[in-house]
Amino acid sequence: MKINTAEFIVSNSDAAKCPKDFLPEYAFIGRSNVGKSSLINMITNHKNLAKTSGKPGKTQLINHFKINNNWFLVDLPGYGYAKVSKKTKSIFQQFITDYFENREQLVCAFVLIDIRHEAQKIDIEFMSYMGESEIPFCIIFTKADKISKGKIDSHIAAYRKQMYANNWAEMPQYFVTSSTESIGKDELLTYIDEVNQEVFKNNSGFLNSI
């Protein structure tokens, strides 16, 4: 898939106020400072579509971007940032939960994980929540240019082992990416394109919204 247009639509903290367009949505979420904004800019070919920051926890709202006029990329706040107040964490958790559990247009979530680190408890717990809530998701491992292929394979194997230990029958589909070197971009966009084709083929509600 080629990205021809990418347009910021709206930011808000209430899932009920998200765009009414019945278009497929792909939500991106991960721990703070995982490289989410850089990844979004990389796959959309827009350097400043999502604002990048060295400060973890910068994204604090649900951000909708309309891509090619027929699907939404949704940028969600990061989880697990210790310096955010308990009250703010609670607010984040509530509207993220509301979005995931009530947003009919959500087709797939992408959970971003920094591949430089070994399996993190908070990522395993978040993916367990997604699985228990029956929310379809894939994993995107970021910053693959920062470590060797051997370490990448080792860290992915560690995540697979942890997920099996948490009663997963299999590991969700995953993508290995690097925003600085555009690694994984084509694979990720091809996946979204294939899912979109299935969505439009099997759901007239989505098709009629284009």
UniProtKB/Swiss-Prot annotation:
Residues binding Mg(2+), per UniProt: 37, 59
SUPFAM superfamilies in the cross-refs: P-loop containing nucleoside triphosphate hydrolases
Pfam families per record: MMR_HSR1
Biological process annotations from GO: division septum assembly
Entry keyword set: Cell cycle, Cell division, GTP-binding, Magnesium, Metal-binding, Nucleotide-binding, Septation
Domain EngB-type G stretches: 22-198
Superkingdom of the organism of origin: Bacteria
Cofactor dependency: Mg(2+)
Binding site for GTP: 30-37, 57-61, 75-78, 142-145, 177-179
GO function term, MF aspect, one: GTP binding
NCBIfam families, alphabetized: GTPase_YsxC
Function: Necessary for normal cell division and for the maintenance of normal septation.
Similarity comment: family membership: Belongs to the TRAFAC class TrmE-Era-EngA-EngB-Septin-like GTPase superfamily. EngB GTPase family.
Name of this protein: Probable GTP-binding protein EngB
